[in-house]
Amino acid sequence: MQSNTLSLKIKLFRDKKSSEINYLYKKKDPSERPMVLDVLLQAQEESVDDLSFRYGCRARNCGVCTVDINGKPRLACRARAKDNDVISPLATLPVVKDLIVKRDNISRQLIGFNNIASKNNLNVEADKTYHNLTACIECYACLDGCPLHKKNKPVEKDNNNAYPFGNPFSFLKLQRLYIDPLTPEEEKLGIIEKAKSLGLETYRRDYKNLKIKCGVGINLKEEVIKPLLNAAYGDQIEKKNK
């Protein structure tokens, strides 16, 4: 017999202190399979009226609703809620309040490297790899397990400086710009130097054991990290990992 409720835990972070509440989600009907976002919206409406979290499109297009569910990043709008789930903010970014994390220290890494000097030409067509990378929704799930991002130790939400070390997201942005047919050849060297300055070498040393996962299924290892490494260090990455 199907239950009319789900029992979950929601972690709250306020004034540098963490707490946990038990929340009983009331299904609209016994067959309902709610998303985690549905749980948060109901909890805010009925129990914790100042519960803080982000969401936008509700259709897996924007990535801003990403939270940790049982310790792993998931899109709240597309993750089915289950009994005993634990909902918490992304562990890889500093918490502002409750489930809201500070995201802009990553985007600051790309200042000066997200503009194309050439005028748009609709007759210039990018290849399939470029279009694959445009599927990124900036959910930052790829930060989980990244050995390079761990070096940033992102704990202070009041720090507005760009993180010194890169991550799969920032390298995806650089790789997409690198293979963009509108990017002039003379700018590509600067893109590779930027990747090196963000610590690309760390991936090179342990490429074989690198485990990074994209929230929407982009093959970050093969489509982002490997081509950047090859552009930066020639075929050395191929020889090193055979």
State where each predicted segment sits:
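Ferredoxin-type iron-sulfur electron-transfer modules in oxidoreductases and energy-metabolism complexes
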Residues: 34-46, 90-91, 95-242
